[in-house]
UniProtKB/Swiss-Prot annotation:
It holds the Pfam family Ribosomal_L3. NCBIfam families: L3_bact. This is Large ribosomal subunit protein uL3. Part of the 50S ribosomal subunit. Forms a cluster with proteins L14 and L19. Methylated by PrmB. One of its GO terms (molecular function) is structural constituent of ribosome. The gene is rplC.
Length: 239
């Protein structure tokens, strides 16, 4: 199981195929996505990579957090996230993951925070039908109607769909196809829409419900400080 990456949503555009077909894509940018730390079974009880992306001024950081980045010898990051990996997919601390960590044609799962809509009624939030336009209904055409029974159960059940705050939820979209990658600019183009607003932080990982292509680099495609980008050595059979 490979690591994912932290990216920022740039926006949407479209690309054209050789046959003239246009594909709507979302542009995701890798902003110096580096490995900040390891989580091991001996010390933490599980195996994972802690990644960081973006940049942050140290003046606004707690001293303990500054020390964490100093030990890893990486510049302070604005966004941190952990990705569960297998033991043979650990990437060295300080390595920068490249855009060609994902190959064209493979499927990925993306996770982000949806756009906030504020307070919304039942018709907008839950797609309720509302009340009738006439026949005695006045003022409350867009209300949700009854919310519970009479004597039995005599209450409104928990988790009843009602008006309330809409958006700002953690949303995962499954099986988006990678259309194109740009290593020099750190861009990943995925087909379709990605949750969140422009500039929002997005987690991208290999699709859980789709097979990983054979040409996908293992444990990943990364660049160590002071070296050119190179694919990590593959694990030998039976190792």
């Amino acid at each position: 199981m490979r690591s994912g990456v932290i990216a920022q949503k740039v926006g949407m555009t479209r690309v054209f195929t050789e046959t003239g077909e246009h594909i709507p894509v979302t542009v995701l940018k890798l902003g110096n996505c580096q490995v900040v730390g390891h989580r091991t079974t001996e010390k933490n009880g599980y195996v994972a990579l802690q990644l960081g992306s973006g940049s942050r001024k140290t003046v606004y950081m707690p001293k303990a957090e500054r020390g964490q980045f100093a030990v890893a010898k990486v510049e302070p990051k604005r966004k941190l996230a952990e990705f569960r990996v297998s033991e043979d997919s650990l990437i060295p601390v300080g390595a920068e993951i490249q855009a060609d960590h994902f190959v064209v044609g493979q499927f990925v799962d993306v996770t982000g925070t949806s756009v906030g809509k504020g307070f919304a009624g039942g018709m907008k939030r839950w797609n309720f039908g509302g009340l009738r336009a006439t026949h005695g209904v006045s003022i409350s055409h867009r209300s949700i109607g009854s919310t519970g029974g009479r004597q039995d159960p005599g209450k409104t059940w928990k988790n009843k769909k009602m008006p309330g705050h809409m958006g700002v939820d953690r949303i995962t979209t499954l099986n988006l196809r990678v259309v194109q990658t740009d290593v020099e600019r750190g861009l990943i183009l995925v087909e379709g829409a990605v949750p969140g607003s422009k500039g929002g932080w997005i987690s991208v990982r290999d699709a859980v419900k789709k097979p990983l292509p054979k040409e996908a680099p293992k444990p990943g495609k990364f660049k160590v400080a002071g070296e050119q980008a190179a694919e990590a050595p593959a694990m030998q059979e039976g190792a």
